[in-house]
């Protein structure tokens, strides 16, 4: 299911928008219990939105750009009047009193909200196994994880439960599940899309972006949700190009940098390496110039990230104290006791682990050794990228070291789980745009993702390269059956 196929259905009078939306909900009702991609659906609201679009079509009114396109929203993004739980007991009953800027722009552009998708609690995870609402399954193999933290969004797109979904990416949470589920996942430049209404995890790293079946659909959504926002001081006041106009440009002469350190890492699965290198050969055949580059501190990104992100999380999550909103424990003889028990009962194990790591890294006597040093390494990682982009236009890596792993494989081994973000976190630390696209399958039939990283605000360039590759390679010929 993609935007072009849906538009053909609608404008050939084969089906009304309302009929298409009803069909999707029927599919969700029958099949999503096996996948568990949605936390909740918003059928009544979606039908009302669909009827409005049908009226515009009937009376030949001008249609907004995303008219009738069914979209799901990750459940850490606020949607007015609908529960925004972050898959946590802490926010299980929280109903957002306002709409996020990104989702508001989608609905203004004619998109239809199908519901809220599952995630790792507070977006802290790489498998969508830490959700209060249960584990999400990978549509390609329901015994495996879809990745995380935007696993529900990626799984819903791959399974055909929506045409597109919105996720958030702090260290790879859009791109990693996109790779595991065989779909397209785009993390924009930091500040390209407003974070207003995104529940904060690590504020200097978080970014909202699309998960779709095609690169062109990702380009459409990015165009709709980008732009300056007075509610977010970190949102960039820069012109937003129409990304669709750049998609089909020739990539002859495009300089693609292959990051040496990524392909030499001992944790890289041989099948993943082989598939991505085949993708490199395809780019070369399409006219791109392939250049090996070095980013000496690229592999230091994971250690740097797991100091900075938990540190910011420990500060951001301090607001959940059981007083103003969120879960409140009924036990406790005084305020301190009540707050302590509310947080202990309201947060899951992984969230508590990261809060403790962050609090330790920021504590007196340790912040110089850990947090400040991590910030210095972050600057060096960005300098490595700057040096690389002096030589090339786009950087290329595998998205993940492996394909989707079995449920439960790393539940008791968080360090191994963290390593699944090895190749994605550097782009977040540097604030750069990056996209994951399918490039092949392993011998188990599981999708493999390839990552393209661009310079600041050069989403048009990575979207162009990704689109040319997608059209030529035709990797995903059939969607998973389950």
Curated annotation (Swiss-Prot):
The active site is at residues 74, 149, 173. It catalyses: L-glutamyl-tRNA(Gln) + L-glutamine + ATP + H2O = L-glutaminyl-tRNA(Gln) + L-glutamate + ADP + phosphate + H(+). InterPro entries: Amidase (IPR000120), Amidase_CS (IPR020556), Amidase_dom (IPR023631), AS_sf (IPR036928), GatA (IPR004412). One of its GO terms (molecular function) is glutaminyl-tRNA synthase (glutamine-hydrolyzing) activity. Signal peptide: none annotated. Keywords: ATP-binding, Ligase, Nucleotide-binding, Protein biosynthesis. SUPFAM superfamilies: Amidase signature (AS) enzymes. Allows the formation of correctly charged Gln-tRNA(Gln) through the transamidation of misacylated Glu-tRNA(Gln) in organisms which lack glutaminyl-tRNA synthetase. The reaction takes place in the presence of glutamine and ATP through an activated gamma-phospho-Glu-tRNA(Gln). Belongs to the amidase family. GatA subfamily. This is Glutamyl-tRNA(Gln) amidotransferase subunit A. It comes from Prochlorococcus marinus (strain MIT 9301).
